[in-house]
Amino acid sequence: LLPEAGTVLVEGMDTRNEDHLYDVRQKVGMVFQNPDNQIVATIVEEDVAFAPENLGVPPEEIRTRIDEAMKLAGIYEKREAAPYKLSGGQKQRVAIAGVIAMRPDCLVMDESTAMLDPHGRAQVMKTIRQLRAAGITIVSITHYMEEAAQADRVLVMSRGRIVMEGTPEQVFSQTERLHGYHLDVPQAAELRDELVKAGIPMPENVITPDACAEELYKLLK
């Protein structure tokens, strides 16, 4: 996808320049909403190997890459399984493994938990935290505010423009403004606001259940 106006640079490379497309695709990997649209093989490890093979990676290195990717995505024990037998969360982790086998610097998750049940979402979020700990940059596009609250940095977009930006605590302390953009806030932040309305003092940076419980414990001591 190319910009209709302006310029998009990926590590200094203009995405409009066709000479850069191969390098850009190696820098950034993408995981979509529906893993069934991203899985192409009949065996998990064959699917994870698909992208490195297309990139011309030597066979011996492909074996190393797919093993590392499956372990990092938490799907190694299912390496010989047929994808259609997996749960939604497991399929999404196969899709993630297939992308990180290309060893991109950045992974873009486009509503990657939207089609999953709560258990599947929890599986994928655990994998995202592991990838972040491994040094991979994660850009997650989501309407689930509980997921956004786990990020290092949050950007709110409206009509194609960034309208809010900051840490989760900075962004989710502005409940009314977020509601103005038709967005919810994490449940812990909603509870914080209701407690404040009831006359119970709560810090604005309370946006997670643990932080909320800690502040309530302080009040009860």
Question: Where are the regions a protein language model picked out?
Answer:
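ABC ATPase NBD Q-loop/coupling interface
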Residues: 7-23
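Conserved ABC ATPase "signature" region
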Residues: 60-78
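Conserved ABC ATPase signature
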Residues: 82-86, 90
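Conserved catalytic motifs of ABC-family nucleotide-binding domains
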Residues: 103
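Catalytic Walker B motif of ABC-type/P-loop ATPase nucleotide-binding domains
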Residues: 107-110
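ABC ATPase nucleotide-binding domains
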Residues: 178-221
